[in-house]
Amino acid sequence: MVAVSAAMTQGVGLKGFAEKYPERFFDVGIAASHAVTFCAGLAAGGFKPFFAVYSTFMQRAYDQILHDVAVQKLNVTMLIDHAGFVGEDGQTHQGLFDIAALLPVPGMTLLAPADDVELKQMLAFAYLYGEPLAIRYPAKICRSFGAEFRFGVWRRMNEISSDIALLAVGGRCLDAALDAAEILASQSIATEVYNCSTLKPFDEDCLKALESKRLVITLEEGVKKGGFGEAVAARLRKPVCIGLGVDDKFVRHATVEQQLEENGLTAGNIAGIVKSNLF
């Protein structure tokens, strides 16, 4: 196993690894595109490379992800840090396009942990996985949910049975979904909440079960066009499917809390949408 950075050793949390295993760490400089090609070469040579990169900088390497990794079906794992809202890092550093960019890539597996426990389990899974894989996570992990990672499974996070389902991507969306379910429960409205930690491939069994629902709402810290919500809606025929995320706009400089509120990813807004579609 080797780790690769593109001049972001400290930012992506690889400083300790670099100091402990200098012979297994490579910083290629401000060259994200080259970093992906470099990882492809390492994988072709029998190594297991992990490339840690901010979501916004991953965009620079899309061509290399497609042609050097995905086409070749190489054993490269991309750790997409700072995915989702990054608050006051600025407008250009929001990590909002990686889901829409990676979902259509043939052979690419895409994961999104809800908390640090699930992230660690995904890293262990990635080490044994033999195909192109990306794991997206925010700059700061949300509270712990005790999430247990099961590849390809959208895990239900409450014991409630309902014809309303909230599908959450990532910890902050899951947090909002669970809080929304509590608000609705206080008004005698039952709501199922799912942790969709495997974005690709889809949980086909869960999709079949969702066909019987009345209302499905997806939540993601990313653009709605081409995102997880649109992909889910394309697969469901019967239920009303509403996708929450970022509309066709660039997100303004603000705190993460403000960005979540301005893009509808709060418990109160989610609960309001559920009620407005039931009555």
Report the location of each language-model feature.
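Thiamine diphosphate
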Residues: M1-E19, S33-T37, M58-Q59, V71-Q94, ...
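Short catalytic-loop micro-motif centered on adjacent basic/acidic residues
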Residues: V2-V4, F25-D27, F50-V53, T109-A112, ...
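Extended, hydrophobic alpha-helical segments in both membrane/secreted and soluble proteins
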Residues: G13, F25, A32-A52, A61-Q64, ...
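Arginine/glycine-rich "motif VI" loop of SF2 helicases in the C-terminal RecA-like domain
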Residues: A44, A70-V71
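Glycine-rich, histidine-containing beta strand-loop boundary motifs that form or position
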Residues: V53, I80-H82, A114
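Conserved glycine-bearing catalytic or ligand-binding loops at nucleotide- and phosphate-handling centers
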Residues: A112-Y127
